[in-house]
């Protein structure tokens, strides 16, 4: 008899690993490539952290149906929120004239949070949201982030809707 939670646990572990990899790459871009995170980047980092930690909690907890749905629902909300922020940043990259220069209220707010003081390398916003310094396959960093958030949202919805009696 196979464990019906095994596919779900594998997906949760994959979600956690993916989020950890994305956060690691963001730190690489910041610390090695000197690409400073903007306020919207920091919010996306927070969303990746929340998704990843929720997936990790679900992986270790291995809850029944209701608990699994709560974890998956939270991950989906975090993924959709992060995706909206990434799409907003992608819009700002394409229409930089809509962006005001100087310290934004978002930057001041984020930098005043305890997270920014506790771990400034990860959560302090110092960059310009409309600055395009990185592209891959003609897509900017916010474009790729939006794609990854969509993938994470889809996986979260799958975990939310999968039936327990499904076989491997």
Curated annotation (Swiss-Prot):
One of its GO terms (biological process) is protein folding. Residues 29-46, 88-143 are periplasmic. The chain crosses the membrane at residues 12-28, 47-63, 70-87, 144-162. One of its GO terms (molecular function) is electron transfer activity. Coiled coil: none annotated. InterPro entries: DiS_bond_form_DsbB/BdbC (IPR003752), Disulphide_bond_form_DsbB (IPR022920), DsbB (IPR050183), DsbB-like_sf (IPR023380). Residues 1-11, 64-69, 163-168 are cytoplasmic. Belongs to the DsbB family. Required for disulfide bond formation in some periplasmic proteins. Acts by oxidizing the DsbA protein. This is Disulfide bond formation protein B. The lineage of its organism: Bacteria, Pseudomonadati, Pseudomonadota, Betaproteobacteria, Nitrosomonadales.
